[in-house]
Amino acid sequence: MTFKSGFVAILGRPNVGKSTFLNHVMGQKIAIMSDKAQTTRNKIMGIYTTETEQIVFIDTPGIHKPKTALGDFMVESAYSTLREVETVLFMVPADEKRGKGDDMIIERLKAAKIPVILVINKIDKVHPDQLLEQIDDFRSQMDFKEVVPISALQGNNVPTLIKLLTDNLEEGFQYFPEDQITDHPERFLVSEMVREKVLHLTQQEVPHSVAVVVESMKRDEETDKVHIRATIMVERDSQKGIIIGKQGAMLKKIGKMARRDIELMLGDKVYLETWVKVKKNWRDKKLDLADFGYNEKEY
């Protein structure tokens, strides 16, 4: 039996539904989600395997005009995937008109000279006539291999997109075991789950300034739980106060919600200990970025 495989990048502006799509395809959460822009900071690999095919999806940070060294890292990390894949899914939202950010990405995609499928997400939010206008507008800018409208949240047309990808795969290796769904270690996934809860629960000024470092993660033989110690890094004392909350209430809530997700992922009982530290202006310091997992070697 012939086995087919390939690498597929998911590119687009922030908040267009790239991580929602990847999680839907994988059938579980491997990329965190929130309604805050620039939630995804690292490339996230999702490995979709059947008996005859393997698609290695690479979810990327939302491409934006960077204002910090962290922003530079995110954008370069996203564009670097163009050197690693055979196909690009360029995702745009059906309920927003094409903007300068989309045009900037399109120019890079043209230069890359690899097949691009336009994926119009959030079709559940618009009238069919509006969707047709969106398709015509984007087609006037670039010769896309295909255009596929979907709803990543509801799953509408996602199987059609997957079939299109598998039909176009070439004969190749099975790069990863069938039971492996991502290349990231558990520590990374744990840190992302804690950061996701901070994004959900805190005010607008806080999310972009937060990083999470898992200091230790090991099984406690006495309690038979995985003991995790995680530090939430922020840039200002005021942000530290917001995350801790009155009498520690917010930090407890973050920890409780994160622990539930971590236990689901690990299939194990977890004791999660969280701390908050201030590291001023860490988003503009390359050494701090590397310490917190945002390393230029990634691209």
UniProtKB/Swiss-Prot annotation:
Record region (G5): 150-152
Q: Which InterPro entries match?
A: G_ERA_dom (IPR030388), GTP-bd (IPR006073), GTPase_Era-like (IPR005662), KH_dom-like_a/b (IPR015946), KH_dom_type_2 (IPR004044), KH_sf_prok-type (IPR009019), P-loop_NTPase (IPR027417), Small_GTP-bd (IPR005225)
Q: Specify the domain of life of the species encoding this protein.
A: Bacteria
- Locate the region G2: 38-42
Binding-site positions, GTP: 12-19, 59-63, 121-124
* Gene Ontology cellular-component terms listed: cytosol; plasma membrane
Record's subcellular location: Cytoplasm; Cell membrane
Ordered alphabetically, the record's keywords are: Cell membrane, Cytoplasm, GTP-binding, Membrane, Nucleotide-binding, Ribosome biogenesis, RNA-binding, rRNA-binding
Q: What residue stretches are annotated with the Era-type G domain?
A: 4-171
Similarity comment text for this entry = Belongs to the TRAFAC class TrmE-Era-EngA-EngB-Septin-like GTPase superfamily. Era GTPase family.
Q: What is this protein called?
A: GTPase Era
Quick one: which gene encodes this? Answer: era
